[in-house]
């Protein structure tokens, strides 16, 4: 779990522990609730993929050099390496990522869960071109020109107000209807279970 060498080499370790220690739990869940783990054993999955990459690289090297390799991968190393984007953000700008309501993106809005008549939909306007498309689909063309919402920074500054407005606009139809309306123009997904 922690590699073959070092003071923790003999410690047992499991996915959920790695999620906690690497910082995943500090990013997941409602801001007013306790930290939460992923719903799946993502560190186990990512470690398996990392090992597969290492194995392929080792085979390619052995094929070209005639010499085999000793491969070593640990759950903790993989979990920590997956925090690279947030670590870079912290090291370069001092930004500490925190849990946000409705699984919102830290700097893009709208990019979170919204309520529909019968449940939830995740809308992800991660490019400016999607904002006018969303406004048109919601029959709210006036939002496109509103100075509070016509760019990412404005929408981020007014995220709470915009969340209420979008919730209200989506409240008159079920999720499936919205997916048909958004099809191909607004990135959106239903919240499904198994």
Question: What would you call each of these model-derived segments?
Answer:
Residues 194:
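Residue-level "edge-of-site" marker
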Residues 110-191:
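Aromatic-enriched alpha-helical interface/lid elements that frame and gate functional surfaces
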Residues 1-121, 125-126:
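Active-site-adjacent "lid/gating" segments in soluble enzymes
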């Amino acid at each position: 779990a922690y590699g073959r060498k070092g003071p923790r080499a003999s410690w047992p370790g499991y996915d959920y522990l790695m999620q906690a220690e690497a910082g995943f739990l500090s990013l997941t869940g409602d801001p007013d609730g306790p930290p939460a783990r992923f719903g799946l054993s993502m560190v186990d999955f990512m470690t398996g993929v990392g090992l597969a990459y290492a194995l392929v690289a080792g085979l390619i090297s052995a094929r070209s050099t005639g010499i085999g390799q000793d491969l070593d991968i640990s759950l903790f190393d993989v979990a920590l390496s997956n925090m690279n984007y947030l670590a870079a953000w912290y090291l370069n700008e001092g930004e500490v990522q925190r849990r946000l309501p409705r699984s919102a993106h830290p700097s893009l809005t709208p990019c979170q869960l919204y309520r529909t008549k019968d449940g939830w939909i995740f809308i992800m306007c991660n490019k400016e071109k999607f904002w006018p498309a969303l406004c048109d689909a919601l029959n709210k063309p006036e939002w496109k020109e509103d100075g509070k919402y016509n760019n990412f920074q404005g929408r981020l500054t007014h995220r709470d107000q915009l969340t209420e407005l979008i919730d209200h606009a989506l409240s008159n139809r079920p999720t499936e209807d919205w997916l048909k309306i958004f099809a191909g123009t607004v990135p959106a997904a239903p919240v499904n279970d198994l």
